[in-house]
């Protein structure tokens, strides 16, 4: 596997700090946030300096019951080619469920949800990975995710599941050591056992990220400093194999450039500590490495069984339907609140005017709206539906100015074409909003 070195997740909010950071050999950018024909100047400058850029996808849903969407695969391939990337990465997760396969409404999670570690789910995942590999111009690596909930009646450990996936498909692995720590706290899984079961030579690179613990639950926030136990797991991994690359992820609550540099240096120190204590202990590399699948394929009946199970879980999380048998109700409640909170955050970024218009009332109003109203059409549609809900159901105590602004916002964006593309009209509306607040 090509050596990448030490890297950091590129985000627009820290673009300047990343460019100025010494010793950064590569960066990773969220694929869905990039437009191939209009790449950010910061990424272009990094590329000109010889810094490798890897697109990191979050929306394929390779662990879902449906086959990967051709349009999403084409978009990921286009970004890899535009960036000259040596590989692309995605997640072992499902992000949507329902639809034609299960004859039920389509539901979007808005986040990465765990795949059951069963033979059925593994068959589906392997086939989906092969579909993706055939559509992509560069190698694919897939990431283990953090989980707040456990599926009942799982048949494989995480190490076994990942080993078989790599063995049957030849796919590379992106190992997130922060997610191993998350699963240790939330699911009682031993990170050392997981590492011992991994095909270490299949590792493409490693993620490191921060989080926090609340009421015995670890939240993989990507908004807090990297915890010592996560660095210890990284050192353990590095004692078993020299990872081709290690990357710091930070998505929210960005610290100063100096603090980011300190976190990157702590990662380097952990890797060096691990290499000094190298043991070389891990599972043997998959014997084929070519993707010769020794398992059975995923027929429609297998996909339907998995689809029904995933739809039932997702519906309980985002639509308030009963908790499926065998799941921990308390943990599902934590996961449901986390999904709703993330949804509120993303809608607030997609439609930044709404938190401004509603002020402190935005978040509680959105969480109340999302409690039993699943997202079905993406975040922009969700923002429109939320405002329509507020206008329809709110008692009117926001004040006439707030309701007027919400109504204008909704009318401006609800049609196929904005009501007015004239700069003068937009300026007049913006001026009126300012005057209303005086």
UniProtKB/Swiss-Prot annotation:
Residues 1-273 are annotated as: UPF0276. It comes from Streptomyces coelicolor (strain ATCC BAA-471 / A3(2) / M145). Residues 274-438 are annotated as: Unknown. In the N-terminal section; belongs to the UPF0276 family. This is UPF0276 protein SCO6045. Signal peptide: none annotated. It holds the Pfam family MbnB_TglH_ChrH. Residues 278-297 are annotated as: Disordered. It comes from the Bacteria.
């Amino acid at each position: 596997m090509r050596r990448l070195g030490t890297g950091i997740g590129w985000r627009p909010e820290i673009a300047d700090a990343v460019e100025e950071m010494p010793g950064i050999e590569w960066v990773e950018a969220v694929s869905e946030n990039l437009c191939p024909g209009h790449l950010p100047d910061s990424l272009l400058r990094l590329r000109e300096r010889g810094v490798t850029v890897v697109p990191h996808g979050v929306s394929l849903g390779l662990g879902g019951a449906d086959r990967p969407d051709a349009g999403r695969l084409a978009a990921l391939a286009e970004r890899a080619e535009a960036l000259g990337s040596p590989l692309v990465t995605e997640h072992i997760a499902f992000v949507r469920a329902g639809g034609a396969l299960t004859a039920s409404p389509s539901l979007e999670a808005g986040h990465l949800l765990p795949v059951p570690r069963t033979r059925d789910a593994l068959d589906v995942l392997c086939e989906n990975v092969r579909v993706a590999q055939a559509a992509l111009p560069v190698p694919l690596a897939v990431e283990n995710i953090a989980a707040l909930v456990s599926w009942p009646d799982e048949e494989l450990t995480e190490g076994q599941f990942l080993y078989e996936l790599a063995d049957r498909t030849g796919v590379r692995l992106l190992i997130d050591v922060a997610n191993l720590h998350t699963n240790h706290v939330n699911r009682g899984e031993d990170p050392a056992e997981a590492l011992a079961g991994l095909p270490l030579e299949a590792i493409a690179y490693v993620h490191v990220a921060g989080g926090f613990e609340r009421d015995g639950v670890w939240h993989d926030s990507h908004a807090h400093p990297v915890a010592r136990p996560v660095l210890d797991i990284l050192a353990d991994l590095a004692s078993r194999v020299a990872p081709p690359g290690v990357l710091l992820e930070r998505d929210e609550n960005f610290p100063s450039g100096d603090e980011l540099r300190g976190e990157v240096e702590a990662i380097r120190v952990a890797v060096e500590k691990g290499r000094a204590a190298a043991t070389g202990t891990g599972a043997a590399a998959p014997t084929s490495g070519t993707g010769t699948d020794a398992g059975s394929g995923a027929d429609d009946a297998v996909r339907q069984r998995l689809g029904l199970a995933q739809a039932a879980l997702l519906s309980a999380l985002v639509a308030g339907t009963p908790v499926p048998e065998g799941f921990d109700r308390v943990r599902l409640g934590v996961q449901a609140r986390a999904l709703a909170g993330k949804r509120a955050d993303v809608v607030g970024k997609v439609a930044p005017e709404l938190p401004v218009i509603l002020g402190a009332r935005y978040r509680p109003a959105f969480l109340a709206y999302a409690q039993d109203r699943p997202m079905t059409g993406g975040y922009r549609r969700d923002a429109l539906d939320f405002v329509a809900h507020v206008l329809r159901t709110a008692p009117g105590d926001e004040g006439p100015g707030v309701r007027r602004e919400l109504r204008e916002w909704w009318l401006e964006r609800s049609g196929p074409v904005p009501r007015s593309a004239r700069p003068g009209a937009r300026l007049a509306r913006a001026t009126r909003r300012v005057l209303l607040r005086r």
